Amino acid sequence: EELYIKVKSGTSIKEIKEELDKKNQQLAFEPNDFGFLFEGESNEGTIGGVLSINFAGPRRFKVGSARDHILGFKGVNGKGEIIKSGGTVVKNVTGYDLSKIITGSFGTLSVFTEISVKVLPKADLTKTLIVENPHLKKGLEYLNIALGSSTDPSGGVFYPEYFRSQFVFNDLTTEGPITAIRIEGSKLSVDERINQLLKELNVS
């Protein structure tokens, strides 16, 4: 099965995620969802907007930015000319990769009309290790250790106490700052890596 999608630039991230979920696939660069911050619907932004600003989420340090996942596009430049670049395979460009130049240009070089993007299979299991109530220095120390660890986390964040009122963390009811570190992979692998990470962080 081909690991790419070809979509119109105005397609919402929500719609793309719903279709990819059916095939157990994902946008690996994981664009953040800020809809709830602006009292909007979740993931109502478009794939064209995401690529125009080269927007990526927590998995960026592992898999790269949105720019690293675009395979090709069609668009319109400032002269009204239709342009296209790339295709639907990874090695499809010689010389300048126009797709990567346009991505992140905020629409100043071209406006996307159609985009081909690489997708990846979802992990079998995802778990998030949460360390409660670290002060800022300790929380950042945990992140530094974890993100450089052989446990290969796919995301990490420190939430200060004043952020906690803005988010719901499943069944976590305690207050105070937290450090969260995400591990993905097969069930056996994830459990082993979580245990190893607990030892490396010296927490229980």
Where are these predicted regions, by residue range?
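Noncatalytic alpha-helical scaffold of FAD-dependent oxidoreductases
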Residues: 1-204
